[in-house]
Amino acid sequence: MKINVIIIDKKGKDQLYAPLIEHYKKISKPFAKVEVIELFDKEIAKAQDISPEAAQRSYSKALEKYLGSGINIALDPASKEVDSFEFAKLLKDSVTVNFYIGGAYGFERDFLSKCNNAVSFGKITLSHKLVKVVLMEQIFRGLTINHNHPYHK
């Protein structure tokens, strides 16, 4: 199984969260190969200075090239909240799963409509770096639920 976490976020070594991301990638290896793809370019930076709508369009343009294969799931605070068991079902029986974390202004509705699903981790606002860690933990938890591993107890 292959899981991609595709996020609109500046690339770079984050000394606080990066070790946690690497930890979850490593412990997920028996179940899936997890890759984090960070996207941020001059076009996105410029669009964010113009307007929220321009920013969303630039996010869609950057993210759409990853929509081609597998199950596509956007993290969207306005979407359905899921618990860990519902989240695990999203991973079950899939060869490739792509998770999308939008930029500061979220997703265009058109991008969300191109995804197979959109889920929320709740109504609180989390930084991109922190939501990436939460997603990585939930991916590992979901994989362990699906494989009857004792982690989820």
Curated annotation (Swiss-Prot):
Keyword Cytoplasm belongs to the record: yes
Origin: domain of life: Bacteria
UniProt cross-references to Gene3D superfamilies, sorted A to Z: 3.40.1280.10
Keyword Coiled coil: no
Entry's EC annotation: 2.1.1.177
UniProt cross-references to CDD domains, sorted A to Z: RlmH-like
Pfam families: SPOUT_MTase
Disulfide bonds: none
Alphabetical UniProt keywords: Cytoplasm, Methyltransferase, rRNA processing, S-adenosyl-L-methionine, Transferase
Top enzyme class: transferase
Gene Ontology CC annotations of this record: cytoplasm
Residues binding S-adenosyl-L-methionine: 63, 102, 121-126
Family the UniProt entry places it in: Belongs to the RNA methyltransferase RlmH family.
Function: Specifically methylates the pseudouridine at position 1915 (m3Psi1915) in 23S rRNA.
Name of protein: Ribosomal RNA large subunit methyltransferase H
